[in-house]
């Protein structure tokens, strides 16, 4: 039974994006906020992905081009930001927007798509601590990757918005390579 929802708000009106933890009451169907993380001005939290162990949450920030790791306490409904990594190589000097974050089906990797640099960043999850280590940055073979998902066959499918393509990748869940 899932008890929490993580809601990201970009904060374009007031400039302060946030991620909120909301506890779901299965009897009443209502949500209650239990915690909130405020991003830096204009970093714009975009999406959050929860690890299968329900203790680790990964959030991407669209304008900040970052992935953040949070340790989550599912008893109290609180989280703590522990790590922040870039979603694009340090050599990128142009515009980029992080657009999607996902934990792969094996629970060993986090992937983030980056629009305008047309790439997918892959990070290995430390199985004990939840911390991330960059595996690499891979071209999405299209223009402006918006969303991606994993099929039951283990393949990764990337939807490229501006090239109107869906590209199928072999994903190695041992090395994290696309």
What is each stretch, according to the model?
Residues 96-160:
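Loop/turn-rich, solvent-exposed surfaces of beta-rich toroidal or solenoidal domains
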Residues 14-20, 66-69, 119-122, 165-168:
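Structural motif
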Residues 38-89:
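Acidic, glycine-rich loop-and-beta core segments that form the ion-binding/anion-interacting portion
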Residues 21-30, 70-79, 123-131, 169-178:
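Short loop/turn segments immediately following beta-strands, especially the blade-tip
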Residues 32-38, 83-92, 133-139:
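A short beta-strand motif characteristic of beta-propeller blades
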Residues 1-3, 39-54, 87-107, 141-154:
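Beta-rich, blade/repeat-based domains predominating
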């Amino acid at each position: 039974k899932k008890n929490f929802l993580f809601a990201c708000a970009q904060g374009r009106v007031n400039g302060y994006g946030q991620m909120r933890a909301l506890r779901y009451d299965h009897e009443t169907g209502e949500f209650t906020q239990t915690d909130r993380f405020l991003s830096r001005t204009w970093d714009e939290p975009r999406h959050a992905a929860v690890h299968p162990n329900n203790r680790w949450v990964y959030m991407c920030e669209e304008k900040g081009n970052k992935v953040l790791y949070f340790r989550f306490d599912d008893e109290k409904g609180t989280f703590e930001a522990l790590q922040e990594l870039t979603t694009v190589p340090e050599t990128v000097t142009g515009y980029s927007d992080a657009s999607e974050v996902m934990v792969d089906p094996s629970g060993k990797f986090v992937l983030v798509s980056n629009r305008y640099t047309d790439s997918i960043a892959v990070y290995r999850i430390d199985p004990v601590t939840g911390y991330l280590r960059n595996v690499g940055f891979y071209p999405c073979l299209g223009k402006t990757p918006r969303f991606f998902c994993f099929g039951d066959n283990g393949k990764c499918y990337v939807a490229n918005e501006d090239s109107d393509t869906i590209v199928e990748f072999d994903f190695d869940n041992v090395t994290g390579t696309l």
